[in-house]
């Protein structure tokens, strides 16, 4: 198949050869049909990408906000080492920081080096949010703009910029456990949304 990796619905996402050497392609519609058949609901691959982008953004904003000064000071060196390793291996750079694997950390490293992470003023907090979004966009293989406009739940970004995010996130951490299959950060994100999505709806209506 010569169409692997394109953005059109007719493009192939994967291909494989069976034991007889027959060449098969897998398109987005095949994956979405599989999800619907096995989940018995009309979910698509984009739903999963949207969810991943949303909870990761929220969790990483919280992680950066909770990080100590010593932890933040590690970021520039970790990023530089990751870039150097990438030049040797040919793989995209990534770091391990506070138990998480992060890609696209150039923005975080620059803010940490200048002492502006997580930031106190509106401008610095906005820069922190954009740097966090860069790490999520790197996971998804999208640009910051696409990730921000099409995948991340606006509630988390709006609350961060208005200064209420961390209070709400910390309260959501002690909320109901909604499934053993969920990561702790996913569970917190669900509690957060369940609690505040009505507030967001009312805000958008006014």
Task: Locate each region found by the language model.
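Extended accessory and catalytic-adjacent subdomains in large enzymes
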Residues: 1-82, 96, 107-198, 202-206
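Charged, low-complexity interaction regions
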Residues: 87-96
